[in-house]
């Protein structure tokens, strides 16, 4: 039995990699330690429903703030991923079989937490013929049935090894926001995201809009991996060409010495510059700060996103 709390067992595919020193974080990266009544209650509900969260599995720096407010990003289809991205702290290996009761448990937890907005993500499941598309759809429908007032945001894998039709299965379940992260600039894909294809991910986002223009599309990248500013701005252009509505940009933080090294810590002023550039390119919503993550403040951001589209359409 693997102990996923031990890095060597959590990431066996990274054992051959040399150790990379983990640099000291600058003052603008510091966060408070998790704790408090709200945090404990969120933790309790997750455990009672036997649910996995990306907040814990990926070591998100914002877990204390989000959980104290009763917000958690639920990760479906297990805690073991079939990919081995060099930036990611999710365990890699052979996943367990799908849990048919998981969609219902997610819906129960959403209701129990009283969420106005929920973010649901997953590991990559290249072992499944549909990549887990039907499981995503079932989870969306279960939440809709139990909490019809809750808006639903999904953060999906790329379905790279699946038939193109599987994307329709997810879109037909009508999430409010479809998020798929490009993660980094295309030049870094061979090292950072070797199991993925940049232009496939772009096309997936574009296809969502073609299938259902009412669904908001969202994507994000990390900076501090070794990219240059012109490359980041080219990614912005590529996303806008794919009609992506919402862009997130955050600082890459190295989970362990075996992971991709932090090239540098991008300053808050540089993030402000990226945000300004992105709005200038036509994104409806941009979140670009050192601690920005895909689901950070997602509920508040969704309200702003919807207001921005209404204003653009003259409905405000």
From Swiss-Prot:
Keywords: 4Fe-4S, Cytoplasm, Iron, Iron-sulfur, Metal-binding, S-adenosyl-L-methionine, Transferase
Catalysed reaction equations from the record: [[Fe-S] cluster scaffold protein carrying a second [4Fe-4S](2+) cluster] + N(6)-octanoyl-L-lysyl-[protein] + 2 oxidized [2Fe-2S]-[ferredoxin] + 2 S-adenosyl-L-methionine + 4 H(+) = [[Fe-S] cluster scaffold protein] + N(6)-[(R)-dihydrolipoyl]-L-lysyl-[protein] + 4 Fe(3+) + 2 hydrogen sulfide + 2 5'-deoxyadenosine + 2 L-methionine + 2 reduced [2Fe-2S]-[ferredoxin]
HAMAP family: Lipoyl_synth (MF_00206)
Region entry Disordered, spans: 1-31
UniProt family annotation: Belongs to the radical SAM superfamily. Lipoyl synthase family.
Name by which UniProt lists this protein: Lipoyl synthase
Composition bias, Basic and acidic residues: 1-19
Binding sites annotated in the UniProt record for [4Fe-4S] cluster 1: 55, 60, 66, 295
Residues covered by the Radical SAM core domain: 67-284
UniProt main location, coarse: cytoplasm
Cofactor: [4Fe-4S] cluster
